[in-house]
Amino acid sequence: MLQNSKAFGSFSTNNIEDAREFYGNTLGLNVKDNPMDILEVHFPGDSHIIIYPKPDHRPAVFTVLSFPVKDIDQAVDGLIAKGVTMERYEGFKQDEKGIVRSESAEQGPSIAWFTDPAGNIL
């Protein structure tokens, strides 16, 4: 029934202007305004997400968006240089940069978390 659908994700923010600045300028993503006061964030491969304003927004307590990168150190260093702080979580062995290092492909990728201005985990 939905196998040919181009699914997309969405999440809320408490301030659409802050979201536009963060996703567009801080992260350098392709952000487009939607006539419904919704942000569309477009990615390579014709995929996108939407970010919508919500007055009673509550930050997600789980990762809402993941960015696979070839060089996690370079990505984290670049984010830190733009003022982004890496999150630290109890129960994870994180290095001085806040990266959880994977030792093998079976363990999955190395991971670092940060939040957007609305507190959503990325």
Predicted ranges, named:
Residues M1-R20, H48, F62-L65:
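N-terminal beta-strand motif that seeds the catalytic metal site of vicinal oxygen chelate
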Residues M1-L2, F67, V76-L122:
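Vicinal oxygen chelate
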Residues E17-N30:
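Amphipathic alpha-helical segments
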Residues N15-I16, V69-D73:
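Helix N-cap motif at beta-to-alpha junctions
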Residues L29-K70, E87-R88, Q107, I121-L122:
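Conserved short beta-strand elements that form part of the metal-binding/catalytic scaffold
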Residues G24, L39-V41, V84, K93:
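A generic "structured core" feature
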Residues F8-S10, I38, I111:
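A short, glycine- and basic residue-enriched loop/turn
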Residues F22, D73-G78:
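Short amphipathic alpha-helices within nucleic acid-binding modules
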